Amino acid sequence: MIKFKLNGKDVELNLDPSSRLLDVLRNYFNLTGPKEGCGEGECGACAVLLDGHIVHSCCLPLANIAEKEIVTIEGFSKTKRYQALASAMLEEGGSQCGICTPGMMIAAESLLNQNPKPSDEEIRIGISGNLCRCTGYNMIVKAIQTAAKKGDGLW
């Protein structure tokens, strides 16, 4: 039995401890925000927060989340921080096709939680584990800067 907190709710699962968290989130909880991209922890499409820090759920076995807290984009989307980031992404054109957006939003939350006023370079480093083929990153960096300014006091 593996116990953990998922998007604020206590969860108990009797599954193989080597099961990938990504598969469990999508197949058992119907949480489709985390996506299968590369399956190797390189693209960030599967990003979630583990005790407030970004991790790639495609590489994370259930055994590693026992007694921990997982937040997916679905859980994060219910917060004021998410609203500030989503508004900034829309305003700055930081989201186009949407494939990377959930993971990018999780990366931005993790970054801003640790550093509420990051420089452009710190943002680029903070999102470096997330690939985006549409925006060229400049609009995403600008969106995170905008969210940090407009959401002053949220992080």
Predicted regions and their residues:
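Signature of N-terminal electron-transfer/Fe-S-associated modules in redox systems
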Residues: 1-155
